[in-house]
Amino acid sequence: MTDNAEILEPQGDHHAWFSLQPFLEAGKWSSTPGTYFKEMKEKNGGAPIYKAHPGLKVITITDHASGKWFFNQPDTVLDRQKGQRFGPLKCKEEYLGKGLPALVTNAMEKHEGARDYIVAVLRERLAATDTTLEHATANFYKDLWANGMGDYTTVYDLFLQQSYAFVLEWIFGMGEEGGQPLPPYKDFLTVNPADLSVLIGLEVDTPVANLVSMVAQAVAGGVSSEEKASIEVLLEAIRSSKMWPSFTKMLEESGLPTQDMDKMFMFFSGFQSSSALAKNMEYCVGSLAANPDFLAELRAELDGQELTIKSVSDAKRFPLLDSFHWEILRLYPAPQFFFKTAQMDLVVPTSSGARYQVRKGDMLCCHHPLIHIDEAVFGADATEFKPKRFIGNPGLKDDVFAYAFPKPSEPGRVGGMPWGCAAHTVGVLDGILKVFYGRWVQEAEWEMKEPPIIDPVEYLGVVGPDGLGFAKVTPRK
């Protein structure tokens, strides 16, 4: 790469105010991102950076060098969207109210302070992490072997039971022996379906397309009375938890707005349970089912071992589990999309050496899975699932922007600003995921309804098919 390379203008289309194309592109972007980005890249001659309009006018970043540049910029250079938004997706009023989605920080509207507050809450509960993880996991398998899967035969629905029990006990103390019971699982699943439809709606930046979007969502019916009732069940459980008075006091002392604080916690605990844990178990289960020889090796490594957050952090003791975990993070990172607005004119590098002009006010969309399949960094097999990829090559982990940032100079900091996943910032998310993976490998035999599909074009950033499900799950003998 050289600073002497010609500076190029991103090619592609940003559509006029009367065009319906932004609405159509948003639908394809959200439902079949692999197909959408493949078509966009081909349309723009294979360029790693190009204009697109999936509901919003964006400049798309798709290779490793540009992604690394993106994640290393402080909020004085690239800052988060205003409001409760993730690109064209907007949090619904019924779900989040006036609360802040404190997952990806910015300097605007106190997002940064809200995320710092969530980090402080997790640190308050850090000592309870291992005990609550073991309690929730033991109960999950005890119930599974006693009662079977019941109606919850998709991988997501099954493991959301384990993750919701853990997260709600860890953060709020719900489900502890002799304490406040967990809210009904059916209410949690209703509020946190795999497609996140209760949480988000679509808001497009061109008037005609946005009108069509609003009509389509109105026809679909919005948040149902059943969903509203389940939301209230979860909010009441949060407000009644033993930790709530302490969390309220901490927030008041922080100077942050307290309006809809309960909804902010519902959002955070729901996202951690669903996208950070249950979805990752889809990737774990599907990848292991597609790689039976590796599964046998992993079982040999894990059988008879006590798995705790501390023990699984030892990559030398559990090299296969560690490498498997990082390969999951590489191909299936979360969140998949990041939207940032340029605070000044910028020049973006790429893996090919080409450089692209970005101007103040441009919105950049960095697609997390695409930057992790760049052959310039991960080799000719970058699109393949290789669970031993990181064994003997631990430095390659620095090129996986786990939980939204490269390896930081200090925990949770890149360029002096907070970034990425709060649970990772406090140092436990890697361990939690490894325990989830490892206990499943130790405990279960399973058969899938359909063969898992690992194809970063057809199923970009996920394991296919949609609704990946079990035909049978039994305890190991």
Swiss-Prot record:
UniProt enzyme class: lyase
Domain of life, source organism: Eukaryota
Cofactor(s) listed: heme
The reaction(s) this protein catalyses: (9S)-hydroperoxy-(10E,12Z)-octadecadienoate = (11S)-hydroxy-(9S,10S)-epoxy-(12Z)-octadecenoate; (13S)-hydroperoxy-(9Z,11E)-octadecadienoate = 11-hydroxy-12,13-epoxy-(9Z)-octadecenoate
EC number: 4.2.1.-
Keyword NADP applies: no
Keywords from the UniProt entry: Fatty acid biosynthesis, Fatty acid metabolism, Iron, Lipid biosynthesis, Lipid metabolism, Lyase, Metal-binding, Oxidoreductase, Oxylipin biosynthesis
Family: Belongs to the cytochrome P450 family.
Protein name as annotated: Epoxyalcohol synthase CYP5164B1
Gene (name only): EAS
